[in-house]
Amino acid sequence: MSYAKWARAVITAASDITDLVSTRVTPYLRNRETGFPCIVYSLPREDLETVAGGSVQTRHVELQVQCMSRSHVEADEIAEEVIQHVTAQTVTDDTTGIAIQCVEAVRPTSIEREFQDSYDGSPDLIYITTVNLTLTGA
Protein backbone atom coordinates (compact mmCIF):
# COMPACT_ATOMS: atom_id res chain seq x y z
CA MET A 1 0.00 0.00 0.00
CA SER A 2 1.29 3.48 -0.75
CA TYR A 3 2.64 5.79 1.92
CA ALA A 4 0.48 8.61 0.54
CA LYS A 5 -2.66 6.55 1.07
CA TRP A 6 -1.49 5.61 4.57
CA ALA A 7 -0.80 9.26 5.48
CA ARG A 8 -4.23 10.43 4.33
CA ALA A 9 -5.96 7.54 6.11
CA VAL A 10 -4.19 8.26 9.42
CA ILE A 11 -4.90 12.00 9.29
CA THR A 12 -8.56 11.69 8.32
CA ALA A 13 -9.27 8.80 10.72
CA ALA A 14 -8.47 10.87 13.82
CA SER A 15 -11.61 12.64 15.02
CA ASP A 16 -9.50 15.04 17.11
CA ILE A 17 -7.98 16.27 13.83
CA THR A 18 -11.16 16.28 11.73
CA ASP A 19 -13.00 18.12 14.52
CA LEU A 20 -10.58 20.98 13.84
CA VAL A 21 -10.20 20.85 10.03
CA SER A 22 -13.32 18.95 8.92
CA THR A 23 -12.65 17.42 5.48
CA ARG A 24 -10.11 20.07 4.47
CA VAL A 25 -7.16 17.65 4.08
CA THR A 26 -5.37 17.73 0.72
CA PRO A 27 -2.10 16.42 -0.74
CA TYR A 28 0.69 18.78 -1.84
CA LEU A 29 -1.30 21.99 -2.48
CA ARG A 30 -4.24 23.83 -0.94
CA ASN A 31 -6.96 24.79 -3.38
CA ARG A 32 -7.69 28.53 -3.13
CA GLU A 33 -11.35 27.80 -2.45
CA THR A 34 -10.47 25.61 0.54
CA GLY A 35 -11.18 27.43 3.77
CA PHE A 36 -9.24 27.50 7.02
CA PRO A 37 -8.20 25.72 9.10
CA CYS A 38 -6.87 22.97 6.85
CA ILE A 39 -4.07 20.44 6.41
CA VAL A 40 -1.81 19.96 3.40
CA TYR A 41 0.43 16.90 3.48
CA SER A 42 3.27 15.80 1.21
CA LEU A 43 5.87 13.07 0.94
CA PRO A 44 8.81 14.91 -0.67
CA ARG A 45 11.56 12.34 -0.13
CA GLU A 46 11.97 8.58 0.13
CA ASP A 47 15.29 6.89 0.95
CA LEU A 48 15.69 3.22 0.11
CA GLU A 49 17.95 0.67 1.80
CA THR A 50 18.66 -2.21 -0.55
CA VAL A 51 20.28 -5.60 -0.12
CA ALA A 52 23.08 -6.90 -2.34
CA GLY A 53 20.60 -8.30 -4.87
CA GLY A 54 19.03 -4.88 -5.33
CA SER A 55 15.68 -5.50 -3.65
CA VAL A 56 14.40 -2.86 -1.24
CA GLN A 57 14.76 -3.91 2.38
CA THR A 58 13.65 -0.73 4.17
CA ARG A 59 12.14 2.60 3.16
CA HIS A 60 12.48 5.88 5.07
CA VAL A 61 9.82 8.31 3.89
CA GLU A 62 9.67 11.98 4.84
CA LEU A 63 6.12 13.13 5.62
CA GLN A 64 5.41 16.84 5.91
CA VAL A 65 2.08 17.93 7.37
CA GLN A 66 1.30 21.64 7.04
CA CYS A 67 -1.33 22.77 9.53
CA MET A 68 -2.81 26.06 8.31
CA SER A 69 -5.05 28.53 10.10
CA ARG A 70 -5.83 32.23 10.44
CA SER A 71 -4.66 31.85 14.07
CA HIS A 72 -1.14 30.77 15.06
CA VAL A 73 -2.53 29.15 18.21
CA GLU A 74 -4.97 27.04 16.20
CA ALA A 75 -2.26 26.03 13.70
CA ASP A 76 -0.14 24.80 16.63
CA GLU A 77 -3.12 22.95 18.15
CA ILE A 78 -3.71 21.09 14.89
CA ALA A 79 0.00 20.25 14.68
CA GLU A 80 -0.06 18.80 18.20
CA GLU A 81 -3.03 16.59 17.27
CA VAL A 82 -1.14 15.41 14.17
CA ILE A 83 1.86 14.44 16.31
CA GLN A 84 -0.42 12.58 18.74
CA HIS A 85 -2.34 10.64 16.08
CA VAL A 86 0.11 9.95 13.27
CA THR A 87 1.46 6.74 14.78
CA ALA A 88 2.49 3.39 13.38
CA GLN A 89 -0.85 1.83 14.25
CA THR A 90 -2.59 -0.21 11.61
CA VAL A 91 -4.94 1.85 9.47
CA THR A 92 -7.84 0.38 7.50
CA ASP A 93 -8.50 1.51 3.93
CA ASP A 94 -12.01 3.04 3.76
CA THR A 95 -12.75 1.72 0.27
CA THR A 96 -11.48 -1.84 0.62
CA GLY A 97 -11.58 -2.47 4.37
CA ILE A 98 -8.06 -3.94 4.12
CA ALA A 99 -5.41 -3.04 6.70
CA ILE A 100 -2.66 -0.78 5.37
CA GLN A 101 0.59 -2.28 6.68
CA CYS A 102 3.35 -0.30 4.97
CA VAL A 103 4.48 1.74 8.02
CA GLU A 104 6.36 0.06 10.86
CA ALA A 105 7.52 3.16 12.76
CA VAL A 106 6.87 6.91 12.86
CA ARG A 107 9.38 9.41 14.22
CA PRO A 108 8.55 13.12 14.50
CA THR A 109 11.72 15.02 13.56
CA SER A 110 10.90 18.74 13.66
CA ILE A 111 8.28 21.49 13.73
CA GLU A 112 8.56 24.65 11.63
CA ARG A 113 6.45 27.80 11.90
CA GLU A 114 5.88 30.52 9.33
CA PHE A 115 3.22 32.89 8.10
CA GLN A 116 2.04 34.20 4.76
CA ASP A 117 0.16 37.29 3.71
CA SER A 118 -3.48 36.78 2.94
CA TYR A 119 -4.26 36.06 -0.71
CA ASP A 120 -7.90 37.18 -0.51
CA GLY A 121 -7.59 40.71 0.86
CA SER A 122 -8.37 39.59 4.41
CA PRO A 123 -6.42 41.43 7.10
CA ASP A 124 -5.72 38.08 8.79
CA LEU A 125 -2.45 36.34 8.02
CA ILE A 126 -2.19 32.64 7.23
CA TYR A 127 -0.21 30.77 9.88
CA ILE A 128 1.47 27.50 8.99
CA THR A 129 2.88 25.00 11.47
CA THR A 130 4.66 22.20 9.61
CA VAL A 131 5.25 18.86 11.30
CA ASN A 132 8.06 16.80 9.76
CA LEU A 133 8.02 13.05 10.38
CA THR A 134 9.98 10.05 9.16
CA LEU A 135 8.01 6.92 8.30
CA THR A 136 9.91 3.64 8.23
CA GLY A 137 8.65 0.47 6.62
CA ALA A 138 9.22 -2.22 4.05
Feature-to-residue mapping (PLM):
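Long, highly charged amphipathic alpha-helices
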Residues: 6-10, 77, 81, 85
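Repeat-unit-sized solenoid/scaffold elements
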Residues: 69-73, 77-78, 104-110
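Acidic-leaning, charged glycine-interspersed low-complexity segments
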Residues: 86-137
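Oligomerization/assembly interface segments of phage tail-like spikes and tubes
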Residues: 57-75, 82, 123-135
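Surface-exposed beta-strand edges and their flanking turn/coil or helix-capping segments
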Residues: 40-41, 53-56, 78-80, 117-118
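Small/polar-rich, solvent-exposed N-terminal microdomains that initiate assembly or binding
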Residues: 1-55, 89-101
